[in-house]
Amino acid sequence: MPLKNYTKTTSKKEPKQLDIAASDQQIEQWSDQIHKLDKAIRSTIDNSRLFYDAWRCMVCIAPSVTASWISLYRQLPPEKQPAASVGTLVDWNKALERQRREVLLALQNFHVIVIAPCKEVKGYVKKAVEMIKRRDKKVKELEKIQKELLVVYELPDPETKKSKIKALQSQLVRVNGELDDLQKHLTLSFPTLIAKSRVFFGQLMKHFYCLQLQMFRKMHNIVRPWDCFQDDIPQTWLVEFSSVCQAAESISLIAVNNNRPPVELPKSGDVLSNREWEAGKIDAMNSLIAQNLHTSASQVSLSPMASTASSSVTNSPVDTHTPSTPIMSRPPSMKALSSGVESQDESVASSNFQVPIISNPLFKSPAPYSPTSVISNHSSTGKSLVISEWAYLASGSANVVFEYVGKNPYFQDKVIRLRRRGQVFTTEQVYEYYQNVIYPLFAGMESFLIEVFLQPVTRDFLLAAQNASGIYLNLNEQYCLVMKDLKDGIEMKPKWLTQSPAAPPDWVVCRTCALSRMRGRPVGFCPLQLDFNNWPKFLCCLQGFVSPDIAMRLFQSGILRKLRDLQEQYSRTDVALAMTLRDVTLYIGKDHITLLDLDPKDMNTKMSKWERDERNLIEGGWYYGRGMKSTDKACRSSIK
């Protein structure tokens, strides 16, 4: 029996055509925006390269110039030398070399974080520019045909006139059809291209200016106007800084609103009053240069309308919001001990367009923390500190950590944590908050909390520690915190284990995943998918992030369940405490799990940022799944 060949016919689906095209006026507006973006991104690439080359040149010639100056200084007669000694100049040169290494480390990834994204945005803009050129070409062709028709209508011969009109009309119909199709395609693709380019460009500008501020602060820490260094070398460096800033200022931000104040260098000798600080009339660069070395940064504050980069100046007078590179190579887990106010993931402001202002606050602000009801007796070690026995380890936005390198058995495997200048809470208040607020919350689970002790410190010790680290400390502190030196482990930030109370009722994505997508960061595991009653589901959620044995330890310990319950309990009654519990770090060692970063939050400086983040998440559609890929799973589907 012969076999029959059966062929399966597949029907091809016609692509869905857009029936409505945007008006010519709207297309012209889009074209104008695209051309401005194209000009801005090209300027960004040129100035970014200038920025990179200028800083490379600066950090390479600075040590040699300083060494030459020291050599000339030594040749001066003693009676003509300034107040500083040669030893002070050598120490200054060593600090400069350390800052130079940090600048070079930060510049290593410059092409990845600035130049490469610039080229990616340029690719988006290039596609739009090509479509604009195609449309302009069709419009000119259409106008040419229309002019030829006007000439043909004036011909005396009817037969010639009729044939030419017929030919031109067919051309007119063809060009009109092509122009309509192109107009529909522009209507479909232009808003997406413009929005994507704007968002990408805004984020790029944010990273570029943060890097610029970081470079400036690391180097300017060395040339800050000391009493004995009012000479030509710092002035020369300030001129170089000015040229770099002017090159960056030539970048046009176009329609992108990143809330960045203008960056200008003040004249030499400018002094800013507290009234100017409070009025918010100064930007990040001015505040950095004009800051008095002998005035505590806690006495001044920026306006709430200032940018994130500007507000970070008072929190971190030397480094930017990112921790500075440690001098000694140590595990990254130690950096968590120094991040006492806020993690980096919660500290970077998002770059958005114009956002409608919500009059009612999204959070209910509780009464500020007051140390009047704290315990009166402090736990003190009773040991004295010698700076030669402590080595700088790491620094964060609020604290600086030193490790013990001496021979006293009491301090073996210990670190001390010193407060940076400009912090709201003192070490004593942080300790009392930890003992009176945090410890009672974890009754029965105290083994997960790190044991801390108050250690008296002197002003001389703080000055020596400040010189050793190159970071300004609060010299009015009377105590520091002593704690165990955690080594050989991994860190994990569980973040929001419950949904934000400000999320819309019909939300699709949890707060943690929504914030990651809004900031363009990889989305990790969803905290809402952690099933504390089902081990297979719990392991499946953490698969790829931690090993199965660590997941089992987390599951059996119950610490994540406890954090979730506490976050839910205080999410509406005590926002500051709830945010502290959401910002904790889990340090997972070989034989223990420890909670870190449980310092109090300053509601006066943090509330506006938290509300701004919630507005951006809600009004940007991030809670509804914006930015999700086809393979991503909705967080709400995991809720029972």
UniProtKB/Swiss-Prot annotation:
Residue ranges, compositional bias (Low complexity): 304-314
Q: Does the keyword Phosphoprotein apply?
A: yes
Q: Which residues carry this modification: Phosphothreonine?
A: 372
GO BP annotations of the record are:
inositol phosphate biosynthetic process; phosphatidylinositol biosynthetic process
Whose protein is this, by species?
Schizosaccharomyces pombe (strain 972 / ATCC 24843)
Region named Disordered? 304-337
State the domain notes: The EXKPK motif is conserved in inositol-pentakisphosphate 2-kinases of both family 1 and 2.
The reaction(s) this protein catalyses = 1D-myo-inositol 1,3,4,5,6-pentakisphosphate + ATP = 1D-myo-inositol hexakisphosphate + ADP + H(+)
Q: Where is the composition biased (Polar residues)?
A: 315-327
The protein depicted here goes by the name: Inositol-pentakisphosphate 2-kinase
User: Is Thylakoid included in the keywords of this UniProt record?
Assistant: no
Query: Which parts of the sequence form the motif EXKPK motif?
Result: 491-495
Free-text function comment from the UniProt entry? Has kinase activity and phosphorylates inositol-1,3,4,5,6-pentakisphosphate (Ins(1,3,4,5,6)P5) to produce 1,2,3,4,5,6-hexakisphosphate (InsP6), also known as phytate.
Compartments it resides in: Nucleus
Give the record's GO CC terms: cytosol; nucleus
Note the superkingdom of the native organism: Eukaryota
Q: Which GO terms describe its molecular function?
A: ATP binding; inositol-1,3,4,5,6-pentakisphosphate 2-kinase activity
